[in-house]
């Protein structure tokens, strides 16, 4: 599992091989069914679970660990142990469970092992669970939308350039990063299970809110080191020049602090996705269908499947 950090920083190597070796190691030790006793072992299992789920989303596949892996089942104690999963990765363990289930259902949809109707029926149930668990975040979204409504048209389409001290006094930096992961799970639910296109109002509502709360995080504040996955997943959904320019500025600011090659690769692929969206628009190809058979969606899937970038 420590080798994954080397891949992250250098951008060289095959993280898939390291993950498979780690899975066999964890399985042989019996840690798929129960938490380890030692702190060091718990740290490695926590790391594996996070890397496995994030990598599954980056490659449009199931997590390597089966869905009955104890880390993919709700266990509030894991966020309060030593080490606490939440503090270690900036993501609540329950949100990790949501992300794992979304990855599994998305893979079933793509490989045809489950019908679209059944996958989306399960997605509705999952969405209900996610909304109930994350109800505390919805007032934040309403406040953000209210603030945007009272500002200029330009600022309503792109985040503000300055953090809000009042906002940060109400909530810790770690809480903001955890909220980013929650809304990223909502975004992936919409895009990969309900098959909403980028331009759908629901996708753009979540994307705007993610940009707003990410804009509150100063690069180098600590927990924001966990931000790449939410940031680059949301960045793909930017549609206007203002939004994309904000992404570029935020990326540059984070790169000045966290100099890992994987961020460079993710931004490079984000630019490719944006450029492809422009090409599709010029060719009059429709992006308003719920089907993932459009050239744009096929392009994104193939781009990710063939890529070597990695983050967690």
Residue ranges and their predicted role:
Residues 40-49, 122, 148-149, 265-277:
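TPR/TPR-like alpha-solenoid helical repeat scaffolds
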Residues 3-107, 297, 301-304, 312:
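Acidic/serine-rich, low-complexity amphipathic helices located in mid- to C-terminal regulatory regions
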Residues 157, 251-312:
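Intrinsically disordered, low-complexity regulatory regions with latent secondary structure
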Residues 35-36, 222-226, 258-263:
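Short coil/turn motifs that N-cap or connect alpha-helices
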Residues 63-223, 233-256, 270:
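Cytosolic regulatory protein-protein interaction regions
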Residues 34-40, 173, 262-268:
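Acidic, Ser/Thr-rich low-complexity linear motifs
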Residues 1-8, 24, 46-54, 182-193, ...:
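Contiguous, well-ordered alpha-helical segments that form the cores/surfaces of helical PPI scaffolds
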């Amino acid at each position: 599992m420590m080798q994954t950090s080397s891949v992250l920083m250098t951008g060289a190597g095959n993280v898939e091989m390291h993950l498979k070796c780690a899975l066999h190691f964890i399985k042989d030790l019996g840690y798929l069914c129960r938490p380890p006793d030692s702190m060091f072992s718990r740290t490695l299992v926590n790391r594996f679970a996070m890397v496995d789920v994030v990598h599954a989303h980056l490659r449009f596949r199931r997590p390597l660990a089966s869905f009955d892996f104890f880390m993919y089942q709700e266990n509030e104690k894991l966020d309060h142990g030593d080490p606490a999963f939440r503090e270690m990765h900036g993501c609540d363990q329950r949100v990790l469970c949501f992300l794992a289930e979304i990855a599994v259902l998305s893979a079933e949809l793509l490989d045809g092992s489950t019908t679209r109707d059944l996958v989306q029926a399960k997605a509705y149930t999952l969405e209900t669970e996610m909304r109930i668990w994350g109800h505390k975040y919805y007032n934040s979204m309403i406040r953000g939308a209210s603030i945007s409504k009272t500002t200029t048209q330009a600022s309503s389409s792109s985040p503000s350039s300055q953090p809000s001290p009042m906002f940060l006094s109400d909530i810790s930096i770690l809480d903001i990063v955890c909220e980013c992961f929650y809304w990223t799970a909502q975004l992936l639910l919409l895009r990969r299970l309900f098959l909403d296109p980028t331009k759908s109002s629901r996708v753009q509502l979540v994307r705007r809110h993610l940009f707003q709360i990410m804009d509150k995080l100063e690069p180098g504040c600590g927990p924001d080191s966990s931000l790449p996955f939410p940031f680059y997943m949301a960045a793909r959904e930017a549609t206007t020049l203002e939004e994309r320019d904000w992404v570029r500025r935020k990326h540059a600011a984070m790169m000045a602090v966290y100099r890992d090659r994987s961020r460079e690769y993710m931004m490079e692929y984000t630019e490719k996705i944006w450029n492809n969206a422009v090409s599709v628009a010029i060719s009059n190809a429709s992006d308003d269908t719920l089907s993932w058979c459009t050239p744009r969606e096929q392009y994104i899937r193939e781009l990710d499947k063939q890529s070597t970038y990695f983050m967690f």
